[in-house]
Amino acid sequence: MSAKSRILVLNGPNLNLLGLREPTHYGNNTLAQIVDALTEQAHNAGVELEHLQSNREYELIEAIHAAYGKIDFIIINPAAFTHTSVALRDALLGVAIPFIEVHLSNVHAREPFRHHSYLSDKAEGVICGLGAQGYEFALSAAINKLQAK
């Protein structure tokens, strides 16, 4: 791992409503609480953490493009874009930054349209159904992978 590795956490549409939206699926934590916990975890590991949440696909794509050469690992919860966005997939493949896909709910136990991901087959790993803790596991895994380099 370099002196100060950088990890980017990307969150897709409607995740700004965490804590309000369908808590039976997504839990009671707000996105701010999740990001605060990740920031502390990253700080304790000596890693820089950046975060972006957007309801706009193009903003997530632009953030991925801007990450090239600057970010060492991406953690992404593409939310509904998981099932629709070839563009996000292409952006991630284009910059060739390793990434982990995270979902708060178990997408495989939900509606059939949520079972397909355009990202999973290219991800270093996929974590779903573990709520906010899934982000912490993803960050730990990303840090471990960077340390193994």
Swiss-Prot record:
| Tree of life domain | Bacteria
Keyword tags: Amino-acid biosynthesis, Aromatic amino acid biosynthesis, Lyase
| EC number from the UniProt entry | 4.2.1.10
Entry-linked Pfam families: DHquinase_II
Q: Site Transition state stabilizer: list residues.
A: 21
Q: List the SUPFAM superfamilies.
A: Type II 3-dehydroquinate dehydratase (SSF52304)
Record-level GO BP terms: amino acid biosynthetic process; aromatic amino acid family biosynthetic process; chorismate biosynthetic process; quinate catabolic process
Q: Which residues bind substrate?
A: 77, 83, 90, 104-105, 114
Q: Which GO terms describe its molecular function?
A: 3-dehydroquinate dehydratase activity
Q: Which InterPro entries match?
A: DHquinase_II, DHquinase_II_CS, DHquinase_II_sf
The entry's active site is: 26 (proton acceptor), 103 (proton donor)
Reactions this protein catalyses:
3-dehydroquinate = 3-dehydroshikimate + H2O
Q: In which pathway does it act?
A: Metabolic intermediate biosynthesis; chorismate biosynthesis; chorismate from D-erythrose 4-phosphate and phosphoenolpyruvate: step 3/7
| Assembly behavior | Homododecamer.
Q: What does this protein do?
A: Catalyzes a trans-dehydration via an enolate intermediate.
By its UniProt entry, which NCBIfam families does this protein fall under?
aroQ, PRK05395.1-1, PRK05395.1-2, PRK05395.1-3, PRK05395.1-4
Q: Which family does it belong to?
A: Belongs to the type-II 3-dehydroquinase family.
Q: This protein is called what?
A: 3-dehydroquinate dehydratase
Q: Which organism is it from?
A: Vibrio parahaemolyticus serotype O3:K6 (strain RIMD 2210633)
Q: What is the lineage of its organism?
A: Bacteria, Pseudomonadati, Pseudomonadota, Gammaproteobacteria, Vibrionales
